[in-house]
Amino acid sequence: MTIKNKTINLIENKKPVVYPIFTFRWLAVHALAVPTVFFIGSITSMQFIQR
């Protein structure tokens, strides 16, 4: 087998990669983003409270 044939075999035998949805990065981003959006929304809504 030549180098070219080996390269073609490696490309043809590649299986699709399945990535997990919930990774540590996903959890870290959402652990910060969800409360941030909540607090920004609550602070914004407080601006419209009438006495």
Swiss-Prot record:
Which InterPro entries does the entry link to? PSII_cyt_b559_bsu, PSII_cyt_b559_CS, PSII_cyt_b559_N
Annotated heme binding sites: 30
**Tree of life domain:** Eukaryota
Species, as recorded: Bigelowiella natans (Pedinomonas minutissima)
Family in the record: Belongs to the PsbE/PsbF family.
Membrane topology note? Single-pass membrane protein
Q: Is this entry keyworded Plastid?
A: yes
- Residue ranges spanning the membrane: these are 26-42
Q: Which cofactor does it need?
A: heme b
Gene Ontology BP annotations: photosynthetic electron transport chain
State a single Gene Ontology molecular function. heme binding
The UniProt keyword set, sorted, is: Chloroplast, Electron transport, Heme, Iron, Membrane, Metal-binding, Photosynthesis, Photosystem II, Plastid, Thylakoid, Transmembrane, Transmembrane helix, Transport
Localization, per the record, is: Plastid, Chloroplast thylakoid membrane
Q: Cofactor binding mode, per the note? A: With its partner (PsbE) binds heme. PSII binds additional chlorophylls, carotenoids and specific lipids.
Could you name the Gene Ontology cellular component terms for this entry?
chloroplast thylakoid membrane; photosystem II reaction center
Q: How does the annotation summarize its subunit structure?
A: Heterodimer of an alpha subunit and a beta subunit. PSII is composed of 1 copy each of membrane proteins PsbA, PsbB, PsbC, PsbD, PsbE, PsbF, PsbH, PsbI, PsbJ, PsbK, PsbL, PsbM, PsbT, PsbY, PsbZ, Psb30/Ycf12, at least 3 peripheral proteins of the oxygen-evolving complex and a large number of cofactors. It forms dimeric complexes.
Q: What is this protein called?
A: Cytochrome b559 subunit beta
Which Pfam families does the UniProt record give?
Cytochrom_B559
Per the entry, what this protein does is:
This b-type cytochrome is tightly associated with the reaction center of photosystem II (PSII). PSII is a light-driven water:plastoquinone oxidoreductase that uses light energy to abstract electrons from H(2)O, generating O(2) and a proton gradient subsequently used for ATP formation. It consists of a core antenna complex that captures photons, and an electron transfer chain that converts photonic excitation into a charge separation.
SUPFAM superfamilies, from UniProt?
Cytochrome b559 subunits
